[in-house]
Every structure is written in structure tokens, then in C-alpha cells.
């Protein structure tokens, strides 16, 4: 990064933001890179800010029993906050003085007041100076407040992250990842965005007192009629806001539900295509979308009328304020114009600024209280260790994960108590759990000496992982003692990879030792894998190691644990994803040799590992079932195999034990996995599903969170808005809502109508887009816009013209913003934070995108034409009013008046043009109703356009080839369906209407001005050109800076979630300070982009303001110098001048809004234009004859046309099969050829990453394939792709359970009856499981079916294959992490239901070999062997070495029938002698 010019900038450069010119110039000429961003000053660095706030917070904790976070913030930021507030107040006060000067200028042209004509020029100079002063005061004040809000957010970000790394595991049980993300994004945005609004809570009352005093001087008591109307209006809009909140709550559940299904579809797109579920998923999502859009339209209409009511009120405020005075005393034109100006300012203060300020304080204090509660939660307590201790000793250890856990099931028991069990079971699945805490470990005692290997075994839920957590200090013992040195290294069961290089993941901040590093790489079998990467061990891995296979991730995690020099190594099932050969080699070379001198605790279920262990600990239901050597085990515990291998079914566990198992499972999800649990105390723990899911989901237990499948227990009837669970005293929606929903300040930066930097103010509001949850405040004010993400949110500075609200040109319709649905979708709910959504689209939206958007709906063009016609009618009405004005004025001059003798107070007199004004307003308002309703068809049609684009994009994604998904990131795809569709639904319709209307207003005003003073028109032309040039100049840079900021925002949340996933590993390695440093670097990188964007935006807004001031000076003096007698004309000229330029400023800002939002349309079009999967017809080699089918049609094979007859046998022939993940990529399979007979079972063998799963995907045509494949004589080129895939039954490695009922998960197309479903469920062992849930087949599974075990999920996949009636079954490592009971069920079903089917199995378990007749050995992307298992083992191959002697005996039981033959075979299979232990031990 470059040094910032701000460091050397002088006062004027800082005042006018001129120091940003270099980056603006560079961004205009070329594409900006991260290296072009300026370094941040020390005052903005995360280290500096967090240190100051942390010091004050520690001081607060030490000094008081009830510490207050707001006191710590006050000591850090108070005086700067006050200073900027005073400057802001002075800028706002100038608005009250402007109407006085305007009134004096108008009065000076009264024929009866020629004395003041000589000072008109000085009054004009004063009016212009007021605009200059306000510009110089407001822009620095607003920038300073947002800068300070950014600093507060940074400091709190750091404080929360540091606290997260210290939280105890018990607290983490109760906090989901979604809650932490929401705490950082939604809540902390309030500081970034709302700080400038906070001062209006005291500025507005002072302003109202001042304005009412001035109005009293003009109108006496009648002025309070206008104020009363404004108060009523504010209450009415608050009521409309409540209506919008109701629609929002109802809509939130549908949006959430749609995004959950969409996210699951994207994450499991390979399974969706393998099952041929594209149509089912499309229908499911479109049904949810239809319901969502009905509520979207209702919400848009209410927002539209809410904003229209605000503008409509302009006439009535003035009318009610003037009418009583006019009826009693009569009124002169000067007072009317002055009153109009005062009322505009007063209306803005009462109905906009004050409610927003109160709402901001309410939200900000609520956020501070949430953060304060979080910072006071229980911390992880480091155990006291004795560094001289060499042994590991545990004495009578008993521990609980959560002593109050049983309360969770109270309501489940109540809800299920009235359900009768037909099979006589003693209760439902959840009603069997104990209501008391169950210890996860009970009376555990053992001692391990230095250098010994302890193997820990046990069935599922026995407490194995909890034992390691106890040793690490993550689980506090309630009884007993633990002794060890404290120098621990840890390898978790679920591999954790941090973003960084392979070397960084292994070294993990420890000092680099070349010899040790190479030894570990070799022992963990990583040499060959690393050599295949172009950058070797400097290859950068994404979050979670997404580019690696499961086995590679597992080996890197193991290497990290071993590289650290520790006294005790804790290895939690490190071999789960490894093939037989690799597991054997790593266990021997790494665990037994390299670490021979170290104390090791290994969790395993392999008999070979137990035999080589020095000590064995078998846990059963949390208790010690056996402790000792293997030689003692068989004698003392003959039934050890059932306890070890888990043959005691989960369903047969005691109620207490099942409670403990589920506790541990959920806890593990919340810390190490992608999912998280939110346990809330007491009354929050309900098993009723939220009403948003509708009647068909009424039996569900859990509420789905959004994009990354978080889950939480939800309160009955409370919609999930953030996708996280809040406490009862912290509702998801505000209980106070003074501001209409669409205008609440939760995610606003000062909007265009809030901080009035422009000469005129008309309320307008833009809310944060759905996916702008990161620290992305947006400034737009004065005529400013603060934008967030791709959705620009306006600071809402509307013109504050004097006559603008009464004059036809100022009567704008709803400028209401799209509501902030970040709470609803929580997308950016969480996926965006994992993925850099780098765009390859131009910095400015192309004209082709606009044209395509307009023409995608046939009615849109006609609606736009209709709006134009209405505009022309209004302009005509305005010209008629001007004609009347000129006519009456002329008559006044020639005939004089005798109004003083008239008996009616409201007539045209020599001092009054009230009647003229009345006619003018009346004619203009003739078209008011038409003006209000003219926007509704446009908004309605644009929402319909959004519906069409969503449908087209969903279809394109479902039909896209897998090669597309191999190049796109899931988070980027999900962003299109969440963030961009939300923009199309909420922000874009009203923003486009704003832009169209504002442009028409400017054009109409110019026409009227030209009719009065052509000189002003000539002055307007260069200003319009300057505006357009400034916009083009700024837009090129601002869009690039926003993109860089968006990319810099991603690593912040990625780092947080990554840290949470690997929290146990971080603590075990003591790497918290290292990760805090990385987090601060991510914060600083984002701050650099965001601060520069704020500064350049302020540069643009100030230049726009200065251009306006120059224009207004010109208009003022042209009006004063060229106008004779007649105050009406000069009044109209000045008010129209302010109105034209403020509206033009607004239009320029609105055009930037539209350009930003249309980038979402560009991205959607990019997805719509994705290539689709080829139908792969047989291309005719000759020209088609008359009766032949068109070349575009698929000519189906005659065998396939016979229903249910193909495939009949399951014979497969593969010839020269080559597969690639992407077009032009390297071949991952080369020239594969083999054949499989009908009903034959074939096993796939090969090292991890050799291509076994790839081959199965190639069978389904999920890759780019070349070559020939036939099933029962039918080539895959001769039939539709969907029909080809339906020939296969699939049990994928990644289990796919989408949010829906059991019935939908088994049969999404609804083809089978309940009888058939129950029959298949019984056949695969699922019937007893499904019957335990309320609703049975109609029970709704959410969050990937997390309430089911992994084995149960596999059985659902197996049931799908049975229902598919497929003749060929593909199984991709179905036994990975399965308990033996489920595995035995799968084996049984394969023997029975698929007895006559062809089965292709990729498996690591030796037992699976017994079921296969032949094996396909894949090595280096090619088929190395295709033989029977007997031949593979007889040969001197690697697989012979991997299979133990006892397993080889299992493979050939018939060879043991006679002693002679057996001895001969045993001699042939003689074990190799073990190599000597190398001197490379750690």
C-alpha cells in the first residue's frame, strides 16, 4: 500500500478533501488494485483503537460491580462526538435564517416597499453566503461523525473477537456462529451508519423552538396548526411503519425458507443432479418465491404510500398554517413564500430527523447492551499445570457439558405426551431423555507414563472426545484431578484448515525446523501430494481447505499436531478419511516410529491399533469399561467387541446416555463444525416450530437458519429474522418503532433527507441492501449518498426549495428506500463472508444491460411511456398556471387594485396575490392523484421483472454443467439468490422510479424557467454538463473502491468463522495472539478501503454542492438585476432555482444509485447466460430428410422407449473414458476401459485422491467426459441426460438431506404411496427411527437433518436408491464415520434389495471386499488393475501389505477347510518382517 497524502495535507486540502484527487485520477484512468489503496493512519488502526477501548473496559470491570460499556466508549470518544455535534448544529441553524432573507428579497420588490429595493443585492449576497457556510460546516461534521463511528466499530470488532477466543466451551454451547456474525455485522453497523443521526435528538427540539418563534412572528397562533398536522403525520407514518413490520415479519420467514432450500441445493448440486431432482427443487423454490412475492408487493405498496404521504403533506402543512391567519387578517405573498420555506424545514425536523434520532439511540444502546452482555460471559479457564510432570494422570474424573441440559426436553415431553405409540415403546424419541444433567464422563481414572501410547475406544457417544477435551481444559471436571505438563498438541476428528499455505498450516506459527518439517511431511504421506501442486507447499489453501480431498485435509491436520514439540499428543480419530493402505503406513511410520518417545492418546476403533498400544481404555456410556493392556482385554472382557465397535444400538441406550450423546453431538457442531447450536435458558427452549413455515411444517422441531445451515432452538411464534436466536429480553424486531420500517435507522447512513447539506430537503431514504451486513455504512448526504455494497443507500438530502413542496415540480412520489432485509435474510446471511465475490463486470453498467432489463417484461416499456405522458400533462398544467400568473400580474399593474375596501379577506389586493397563488396551486394539484398512482404500475411491473429474472436464473443454475460449479464458489452463487434478488425486489424498483421522476422534474422545471427567464436556462446548461462530468469522473473510482471494500470485508468474517471452527486447536497450540494479529490485519485492510471510499464520496458531494452554490449565485443576481416590480416573479425564480439544482443533484446521486444497483442485474444476467448441460443428441452425419426429426431433438434408443425395461440387466461397458473437471483443464481420468457383467459387484481401490469418486461422477456425466459408455447396449450419446442418470441409484459420500419432511426427502416428486414408503423405510431400518418423531413421515427435517445420526442419513440415501428401482448402484464411501450397526444394515440391504443389481463400491473397510467379485485399482488417473481380490492379495502388491494376516484369512475362509491347504496358503502369505525403527523419532 502507498503512503496516504492525508499525512502531508494542509488545512484547506483536508477541508475540501482535495487530498483524494490522486486516487480519483488513477481510478478514472485505470483499474484500481489493492496496492493502490492508501495506508491507514495510526488513529484508524485496529491495534491502537482496540488497545484504548480494552484499557477503558478493563478499568470499568475493575472499578464497578455492574460495568457499563457505554462508559468505556464515552471516555474514548465523547469530546470528539460533542465537537462534531456543535459544528453540525451550526450548519443546521443556517436553514432557519435562509427563509428570512428570501422573504426580505421578495418584499423588496413589492411596489409599496421600494425603499428596500437598494438592499436586495446585499440580501442576495447574504443568502449565497449562507449556502457557502452551510457547505463548509456540514460536510466536515458529517465526515467526522462517520469517521468516529467507523473507529468505534473497529474497536468493538476487536474486543468481541478477543473475547470469542476466550469463551468457555460451556458458553459456546449457547452461542451459535450466526449470533456472533450478527453481533459483529447487524449491531455494530449502527455505529458506522447512525452516529451522525444521534445529535438530532437535541438539535431538532432547539430547531423547532427557533422555527416556531419565527413562524409566530409571521402568523401568530395559526402557525401551531401546521405543527399539529406534522405531529399527526408523524404518528400516521409510525402506524404505517408498524404495518410494514407485520408484512416484513411474515415475509422474512419465506425469504429465509427459500434461501435455506437454495443454499442446500447449491451445496449439494452434485447430489441434486445425480438424483435428477432439478425439477423438484425448482418447483419447491418457485412455490416459496411466489408466496414471498405476494408479501413483497404488499410491503412495497405500503412503503410507496408512506413516502407519498410525506410529500403530499407539504401542501397541507402550509395551507393549515396560512389559512387561519389569511381568513382573519389576510396575507401577503411574501409571508406565503417565507412560510413555505419554514414549513419545509420544520416538516423535515419533526417527521424525519427526530424519529430517526430517537430510533438510532434506541438501536445503538440496545447494541451496546448486547455487546456488554457478551463481553461479560464466562471465559475459558486455563488449568494449572506442572511442567516437571512427565506422566498423564486422571483420578476419579466426573464431568458435565451442561448441567441444565435436560431442561431442553421439557416441552418436547409435554408436546409428545398425548401421542400414542403403536409399537409399545416407552415414549417418543425425545421424551426418553432425562430431565436432569447426565455426566458425560463418570469416575474415569488412568495413568500413562512418558512415551506410552494409550488407545481410547468405545461406541458412539461413549465420551471419547470429551475425554480429550477434559485433558485440554475445555471441559471442567466436577470431581477428580488431572495431572500433566500442559505442553499439549491436538489433532481434531474433523480436519481444520486455516486460509493460508500448506506450510503455514503445518508450522502454525511455530519456529521453522527444516529437518523436523521434512520428517513430518514424510511420515504423514504428504510428499507425493505436495509434489503435485505447482507451488508445492507454498500452495494457498482456501477456507476449510476446499481444494483438498478429505484425506489430504486429515493428513495436514495430523502433520500440524505432530510438528509441534509437545509432551502429550491428543489424536481424535485422525484416520477417518484415509484409505486402508495410507492409514496403515501413517500409523506405523508416524504414530509408532516418529512419535515413539512421546506420550500419545489415540481415539480409534481399529483392532490393529489396539494391539500395538501400550494401554487401552474402553469407554461405555461415559464410564471406564476396561483399562489395561490388550493381552488382558480378551480374558477379562470377552464382550469387548460390542462395546468397542458400537454393536449396542443407539436406540437401546439408556435415557440418560442418549441425552449425554446428543449434548456432545450438538456441542461439537457448535464449535468445530459448520453448524452451531443456540441453547437458550428456560422458556426459550421450545420444540414448536416457528409459524413462518406454515401448516405443512408445523411438526418441525428446529428452525432453519440461512446460508450456512446454522440452527437454533426457537421460541414458539417468534419469526427468525437474523437466523439466530435472541434472548427474550432482546427481541428480533424492535419493540420501539418510531420510524416506519422502511426508514428505520438500523442500517442507514445519514440519508438524503436527514442531514441537510443541500439547499432544499425532501425526505428520501435508502436502506442497506440485503447483503451488506459487513461494516459497510454508506454515506450519502446532502445530496449525498452513502452506499453499501452494490446497493447505494442515500443519505437522503432532498432539495429544500422554498416553493418546491407546493410547486408541481417538487411533488415527488415515494422516495422510500427498499427496506433493510439484512435481518430477514441474514445472508449476507452468512455465506458471503466465506467468499470473495470478485466481479468481472465493468465499473459502470453497460447500456446493453439497461436495454435488456427494460425489454424483459412486455409491459414495462408501456408503463414508462405512460409515465412520460403524465409528465407532459403536468408540465402543460404548470405552463397554464404561469400564464395565469403573468395575466393577473399584468392586470394588477395596469388596473391597480382596491382590495383594501373589499369585504372578503382572501382576495387580490394591492399587497396580496393570494388568489393567484391559490389558482396556481389548484391547477398543479389537479394532477396530484394521478401523480401519486403513476408510480404504482411501474413498481408493480419492476417486481414482476425481478420474478422473471429469479426464475430464469434458477433454471440456468439447475441446468448448468458441473464444470461451472467447479469454477464458481457456492457463496458467490448464493449471493445472487439472496443479495442481488433482494436488491431487485426492494431497492431497484423505487430507485428507478426516483431517477425517472427526478429527471422529468428537472426537465419540466427547466421548461418553466425558460418561459420566465431564458438567461437562467443558459446558466443551467454548463452546470448540467459539470454535474454529468463529475458523476462520470467519480463513478469510475467509487465503484472500484466499493468492490475492493467488499473483497476486503470478506476476510474479516471468514477469519472469525475459521477461528470458531478451530477454536480447540487454537487453544491447544496457544495461537490466540497470532490469530488476533491476523484479525487486526484483516480489519486494517478493510478500513483502508472503506475510509478512502468515505473520503472520495465526501469529495464528490462537496464538489456537487459547490457547483450548486455557484449556480445559485448566478441565478440570484440574474433574478435581482432583471426583475422589476412584482414580488411573485422573483419569488418563483429563486425557489425554482434552488429546486432545479437540488433536484439535479439528487438526480445525479440517484443515477449513481441506479448504476450501483444495476450491477446486481448484470450479475444475474451473467448467471442466466451460463451454458447448460448438453442434451447430447446423436448428431446425424448426413443432411436430414423430410420426415426425419429435427437435429435439435434427442433421438432416443429403442430399448429406452420401452417403459421400465431399461436398464434390465445392469451391464456396463466403458471404453476410453477420459474426464476433466473443467473445459481445457487437465484430465483427472485417462483412457479408462473395463466392462461389468449384469449383477456383478465391483469395488474401487486406490489411495486418497486417486480418482475413485471422480470415476463415479463420470458415470453420471457430471464431468466433462470423452469416450464411450453403454448400459445394456444403450450408449449415453443416444438418450437424454436425465434418463441416463435415472439408470443409477446413488449413495454419495456427502449425504444430502434438504429442509423438508421425511416424505419429501424420500420421494420429492410424490410418486409413491405411504404404504410403499413405509415398506422401504422398514427394509432399510428407518421405520423405527421415523416413528419416533411427531408427524412421522410429515416431520420436517431442517439444518441438513442434524437431529439424525450420520448413519440414519445414509439410510435415507439408501432408501432413495431402493425407491428409484435402479439397476446400477453407486456407493461412494458409504461407511465413512458410520457406526457398525448402520454399516451392517447397509450391507444387509445391498444383499437383499440389490441382489440382482450391479453395484460399484468405493470403500475403505476391509469387510466391504467380501461382497465384491472384482476390484478396479485406480492409480495416477488410470486403471492399473481390474482383478479379483484373491489375485490382488496373492500378488506382491501394496494392497497385500495393507491387509493384515487375520483379514486375509477372512477373505479365504474356504481355504481353511484342511490343515494342509491352510498351512500352504499361510506360507504363501507370510508376514514381512518389520523394518527397524529409524532414528527420526520426535
Curated annotation (Swiss-Prot):
The source organism is Didelphis virginiana
> What keywords is this UniProt entry annotated with?
ATP-binding, Cell membrane, Chloride, Chloride channel, Endoplasmic reticulum, Endosome, Glycoprotein, Ion channel, Ion transport, Isomerase, Isopeptide bond, Lipoprotein, Membrane, Nucleotide-binding, Nucleus, Palmitate, Phosphoprotein, Repeat, Transmembrane, Transmembrane helix, Transport, Ubl conjugation
Attached lipid, kind S-palmitoyl cysteine, located at: 524, 1397
Residues in the Cytoplasmic compartment per record: 1-77, 147-195, 244-298, 359-859, 941-991, 1036-1096, 1153-1482
Q: Where is this cross-link: Glycyl lysine isopeptide (Lys-Gly) (interchain with G-Cter in ubiquitin)?
A: 688
Annotated membrane topology is: Multi-pass membrane protein
Pinpoint the ABC transmembrane type-1 domain residues: 81-365, 860-1156
Name of the protein described by the UniProt record: Cystic fibrosis transmembrane conductance regulator
| Binding positions (ATP 1) | 401, 434, 458-465, 493
The record's Pfam families line, in alphabetical order, gives: ABC_membrane (PF00664), ABC_tran (PF00005), CFTR_R (PF14396)
Please indicate the residue ranges that the annotation assigns to the motif PDZ-binding.
Answer: 1480-1482
- Per the record, what are the reactions this protein catalyses? ATP + H2O + closed Cl(-) channel = ADP + phosphate + open Cl(-) channel; chloride(in) = chloride(out); hydrogencarbonate(in) = hydrogencarbonate(out); ATP + H2O = ADP + phosphate + H(+)
Segments passing through the bilayer = 78-98, 123-146, 196-216, 223-243, 299-319, 340-358, 860-880, 920-940, 992-1012, 1015-1035, 1097-1117, 1132-1152
- Lineage of source species: Eukaryota, Metazoa, Chordata, Craniata, Vertebrata
GO annotations under biological process?
bicarbonate transport; cellular response to cAMP; cellular response to forskolin; chloride transmembrane transport; intracellular pH elevation; membrane hyperpolarization; multicellular organismal-level water homeostasis; response to endoplasmic reticulum stress
Phosphoserine PTM sites in chain numbering: 549, 660, 670, 686, 700, 712, 737, 769, 796, 814, 1446, 1458
Amino acid at each position: 500500500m502507498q503512503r496516504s497524502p492525508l499525512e502531508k495535507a494542509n488545512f484547506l486540502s483536508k477541508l475540501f478533501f482535495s487530498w483524494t484527487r490522486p486516487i480519483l485520477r488513477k481510478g478514472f484512468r485505470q483499474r484500481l488494485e489493492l496496492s493502490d489503496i492508501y495506508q491507514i493512519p495510526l488513529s484508524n488502526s485496529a491495534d491502537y483503537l482496540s488497545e484504548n477501548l480494552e484499557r477503558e473496559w478493563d478499568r470499568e470491570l475493575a472499578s464497578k460491580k455492574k460495568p457499563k460499556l457505554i462508559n468505556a466508549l464515552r471516555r474514548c470518544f465523547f469530546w470528539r462526538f460533542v465537537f462534531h455535534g456543535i459544528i453540525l448544529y451550526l450548519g443546521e441553524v443556517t436553514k432557519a435564517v435562509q427563509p428570512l432573507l428570501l422573504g426580505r428579497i421578495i418584499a423588496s420588490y413589492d411596489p409599496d416597499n421600494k425603499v428596500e429595493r437598494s438592499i436586495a443585492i446585499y440580501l442576495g449576497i447574504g443568502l449565497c453566503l449562507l449556502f457557502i457556510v452551510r457547505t463548509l460546516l456540514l460536510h466536515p461534521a458529517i465526515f467526522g461523525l462517520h469517521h468516529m463511528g467507523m473507529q468505534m466499530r473497529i474497536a468493538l470488532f476487536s474486543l468481541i473477537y478477543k473475547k470469542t477466543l476466550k469463551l468457555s466451551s460451556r458458553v459456546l454451547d449457547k452461542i451459535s456462529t450466526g449470533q456472533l456474525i450478527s453481533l459483529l455485522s447487524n449491531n455494530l453497523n449502527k455505529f458506522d451508519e447512525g452516529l451522525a443521526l444521534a445529535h438530532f435528538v437535541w438539535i431538532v427540539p432547539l430547531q423547532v423552538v427557533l422555527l416556531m418563534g419565527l413562524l409566530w412572528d409571521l402568523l401568530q397562533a395559526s402557525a401551531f396548526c401546521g405543527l399539529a398536522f406534522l405531529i399527526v403525520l408523524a404518528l400516521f407514518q409510525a402506524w404505517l411503519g408498524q404495518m410494514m413490520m407485520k408484512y416484513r415479519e411474515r415475509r422474512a420467514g419465506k425469504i429465509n425458507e427459500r434461501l435455506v432450500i437454495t443454499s442446500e441445493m447449491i451445496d449439494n448440486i452434485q447430489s441434486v443432479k445425480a438424483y435428477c431432482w432439478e425439477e423438484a427443487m425448482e418447483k419447491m423454490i418457485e412455490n416459496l418465491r411466489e408466496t414471498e412475492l405476494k408479501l413483497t408487493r404488499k410491503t412495497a405498496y405500503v412503503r410507496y404510500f408512506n413516502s407519498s404521504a410525506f410529500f403530499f403533506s407539504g401542501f397541507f402543512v402550509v395551507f393549515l398554517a396560512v389559512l387561519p391567519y389569511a381568513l382573519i387578517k389576510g396575507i401577503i405573498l411574501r409571508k406565503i413564500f417565507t412560510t413555505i420555506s419554514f414549513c419545509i424545514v420544520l416538516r423535515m425536523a419533526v417527521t424525519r430527523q427526530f424519529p430517526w434520532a430517537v430510533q438510532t439511540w434506541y438501536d445503538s444502546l440496545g447494541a451496546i447492551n448486547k455487546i456488554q452482555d457478551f463481553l461479560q460471559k464466562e471465559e475459558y479457564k486455563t488449568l494449572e499445570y506442572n511442567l516437571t510432570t512427565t506422566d498423564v494422570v486422571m483420578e476419579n474424573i466426573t464431568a458435565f457439558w451442561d448441567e441444565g441440559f435436560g431442561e431442553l426436553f421439557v416441552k418436547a415431553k409435554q408436546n409428545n405426551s398425548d401421542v400414542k405409540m403403536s409399537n409399545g415403546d416407552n415414549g417418543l424419541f425425545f421424551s426418553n431423555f432425562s430431565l436432569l444433567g447426565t455426566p458425560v464422563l463418570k469416575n474415569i481414572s488412568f495413568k500413562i507414563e512418558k512415551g506410552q501410547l494409550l488407545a481410547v475406544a468405545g461406541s458412539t457417544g461413549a465420551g471419547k472426545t470429551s475425554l480429550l477435551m477434559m485433558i485440554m481444559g475445555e471441559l471442567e471436571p466436577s470431581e477428580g484431578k488431572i495431572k500433566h505438563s500442559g505442553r499439549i498438541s491436538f489433532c481434531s476428528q474433523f480436519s481444520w484448515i486455516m486460509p493460508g499455505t500448506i506450510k503455514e498450516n503445518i508450522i502454525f506459527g511455530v519456529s521453522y525446523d527444516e529437518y523436523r518439517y521434512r520428517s513430518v511431511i514424510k511420515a504423514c504421506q504428504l510428499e507425493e501430494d505436495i509434489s503435485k501442486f505447482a507451488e508445492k507447499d507454498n500452495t494457498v489453501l482456501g477456507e476449510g481447505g476446499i481444494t483438498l480431498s478429505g484425506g489430504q485435509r486429515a493428513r495436514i491436520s495430523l502433520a500440524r499436531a505432530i510438528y509441534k514439540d509437545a509432551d502429550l499428543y491428543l489424536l481424535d480419530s485422525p484416520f477417518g478419511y484415509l484409505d486402508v493402505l495410507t492409514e496403515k503406513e501413517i500409523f506405523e511410520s508416524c504414530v509408532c516410529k516418529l512419535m515413539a518417545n512421546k506420550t500419545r492418546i489415540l481415539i480409534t476403533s481399529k483392532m490393529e491399533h489396539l494391539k500395538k498400544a501400550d494401554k487401552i481404555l474402553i469407554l461405555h456410556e461415559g464410564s471406564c469399561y476396561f483399562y489395561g493392556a490388550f493381552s488382558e482385554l480378551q480374558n477379562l472382557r470377552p464382550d469387548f467387541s460390542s462395546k468397542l465397535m458400537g454393536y449396542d444400538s443407539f436406540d437401546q441406550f439408556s435415557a440418560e446416555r442418549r441425552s449425554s450423546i446428543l449434548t456432545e453431538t450438538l456441542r461439537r457442531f457448535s464449535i468445530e463444525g459448520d453448524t452451531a447450536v443456540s441453547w437458550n435458558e428456560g422458556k426459550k427452549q421450545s420444540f414448536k416450530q416457528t409459524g413462518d413455515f406454515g401448516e405443512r411444517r408445523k411438526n418441525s422441531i428446529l428452525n432453519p437458519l440461512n446460508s450456512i445451515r446454522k440452527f437454533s432452538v426457537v421460541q414458539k411464534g417468534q419469526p427468525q429474522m437474523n437466523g439466530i436466536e435472541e434472548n427474550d429480553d432482546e427481541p428480533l424486531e424492535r419493540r420501539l418503532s418510531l420510524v416506519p420500517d422502511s426508514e428505520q435507522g438500523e442500517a442507514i447512513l445519514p440519508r438524503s433527507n436527514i442531514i441537510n447539506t443541500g439547499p432544499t430537503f425532501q425526505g428520501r431514504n435508502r436502506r442497506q441492501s440485503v447483503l451488506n451486513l459487513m461494516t459497510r455504512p454508506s454515506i450519502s448526504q446532502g445530496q449525498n449518498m452513502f452506499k453499501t455494497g452494490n446497493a447505494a443507500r442515500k443519505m437522503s438530502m432532498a432539495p429544500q426549495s422554498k416553493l418546491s413542496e407546493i410547486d408541481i415540480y417538487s411533488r415527488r412520489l415515494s422516495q422510500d428506500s427498499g427496506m433493510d432485509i439484512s435481518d430477514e435474510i441474514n445472508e449476507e446471511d452468512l455465506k458471503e463472508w466465506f467468499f470473495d465475490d470478485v466481479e468481472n463486470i465493468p465499473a459502470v453498467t453497460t447500456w446493453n444491460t439497461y436495454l435488456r432489463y427494460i425489454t424483459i417484461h412486455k409491459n414495462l416499456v408501456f408503463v414508462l411511456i405512460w409515465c412520460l405522458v403524465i409528465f407532459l400533462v403536468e408540465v402543460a398544467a404548470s405552463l397554464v398556471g404561469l400564464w395565469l400568473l403573468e395575466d393577473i400580474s399584468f392586470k394588477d399593474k395596469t388596473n391597480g387594485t382596491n382590495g383594501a375596501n373589499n369585504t372578503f379577506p382572501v382576495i387580490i389586493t394591492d399587497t396580496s396575490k393570494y388568489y393567484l397563488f391559490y389558482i396556481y396551486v389548484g391547477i398543479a394539484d389537479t394532477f396530484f392523484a394521478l401523480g401519486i398512482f403513476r408510480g404504482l404500475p411501474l413498481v408493480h411491473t419492476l417486481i414482476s421483472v425481478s420474478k422473471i429474472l429469479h426464475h430464469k436464473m434458477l433454471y440456468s443454475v439447475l441446468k448448468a454443467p458441473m464444470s461451472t460449479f467447479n469454477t464458481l464458489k457456492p457463496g458467490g452463487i448464493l449471493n445472487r439468490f439472496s443479495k442481488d434478488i433482494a436488491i431487485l425486489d426492494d431497492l431497484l424498483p423505487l430507485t428507478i422510479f426516483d431517477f425517472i421522476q427526478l429527471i422529468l422534474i428537472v426537465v419540466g422545471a427547466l421548461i418553466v424557467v425558460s418561459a420566465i427567464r431564458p438567461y437562467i436556462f443558459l446558466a443551467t446548461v454548463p452546470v448540467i454538463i459539470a454535474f454529468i462530468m463529475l458523476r462520470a469522473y467519480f463513478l469510475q473510482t467509487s465503484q472500484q473502491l466499493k468492490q475492493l471494500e467488499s473483497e476486503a470485508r470478506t476476510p474479516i468474517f471468514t477469519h472469525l468463522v475459521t477461528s470458531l471452527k478451530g477454536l480447540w486447536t487454537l487453544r491447544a497450540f496457544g495461537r490466540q495472539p497470532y490469530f488476533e494479529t491476523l484479525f487486526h490485519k484483516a480489519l486494517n485492510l478493510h478500513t483502508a478501503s472503506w475510509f478512502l471510499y468515505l473520503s472520495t464520496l465526501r469529495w464528490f458531494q462537496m464538489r456537487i454542492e459547490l457547483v450548486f452554490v455557484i449556480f445559485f449565485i448566478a441565478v440570484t443576481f440574474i433574478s435581482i438585476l432583471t426583475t422589476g416590480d412584482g414580488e411573485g416573479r422573483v419569488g418563483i425564480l429563486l425557489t425554482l432555482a434552488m429546486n432545479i439544482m437540488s433536484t439535479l443533484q439528487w438526480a445525479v446521486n440517484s443515477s449513481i444509485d441506479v448504476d450501483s444497483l444495476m450491477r446486481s442485474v448484470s450479475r444475474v444476467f451473467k448467471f442466466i447466460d451460463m451454458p447448460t448441460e448438453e442434451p447430447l443428441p446423436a448428431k446425424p452425419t448426413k443432411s436430414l430428410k423430410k420426415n426425419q426429426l429435427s437435429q435439435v431433438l434427442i433421438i432416443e434408443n429403442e430399448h429406452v422407449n420401452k417403459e421400465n425395461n431399461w436398464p434390465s440387466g445392469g451391464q456396463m461397458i466403458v471404453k476410453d473414458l477420459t474426464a476433466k473437471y473443467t473445459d481445457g483443464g487437465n484430465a483427472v481420468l485417462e483412457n479408462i476401459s473395463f466392462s461389468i457383467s449384469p449383477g456383478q459387484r465391483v469395488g474401487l481401490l486406490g489411495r486418497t485422491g486417486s480418482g475413485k469418486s471422480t470415476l463415479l461422477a463420470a458415470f453420471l456425466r457430471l464431468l466433462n467426459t470423452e469416450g464411450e459408455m453403454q448400459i445394456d447396449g444403450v450408449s449415453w450419446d443416444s438418450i437424454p441426460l436425465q434418463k441416463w442418470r435415472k439408470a443409477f441409484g446413488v449413495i454419495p459420500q456427502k449425504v444430502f438431506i434438504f429442509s423438508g419432511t421425511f416424505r419429501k426427502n424420500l420421494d420429492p416428486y410424490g410418486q409413491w404411496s405411504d404404504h410403499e414408503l413405509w415398506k422401504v423405510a422398514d427394509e432399510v431400518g428407518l421405520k423405527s427411527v421415523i416413528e419416533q418423531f411427531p408427524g412421522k413421515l410429515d416431520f420436517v427435517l431442517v439444518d441438513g437433518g442434524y437431529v439424525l445420526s450420520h448413519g440414519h442419513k445414509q439410510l435415507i440415501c439408501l432408501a432413495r436408491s431402493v425407491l428409484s428401482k435402479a439397476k446400477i448402484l453407486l456407493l461412494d464411501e458409504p461407511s465413512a464415520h458410520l457406526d457398525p450397526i448402520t454399516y451392517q444394515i447397509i450391507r444387509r440391504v445391498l444383499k437383499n434389495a440389490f441382489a440382482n443389481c450391479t453395484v460399484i463400491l468405493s470403500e475403505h473397510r476391509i469387510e466391504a471386499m467380501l461382497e465384491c467379485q472384482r476390484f478396479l485399482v485406480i492409480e495416477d488417473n488410470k486403471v492399473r488393475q481390474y482383478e479379483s481380490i484373491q489375485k490382488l492379495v496373492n500378488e506382491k502388491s501394496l494392497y497385500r501389505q495393507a491387509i493384515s494376516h487375520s483379514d486375509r484369512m477372512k477373505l479365504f475362509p474356504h481355504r481353511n477347510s484342511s490343515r494342509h491347504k491352510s498351512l500352504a496358503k499361510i506360507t504363501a502369505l507370510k508376514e514381512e518382517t518389520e523394518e527397524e525403527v529409524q532414528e527420526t523419532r520426535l
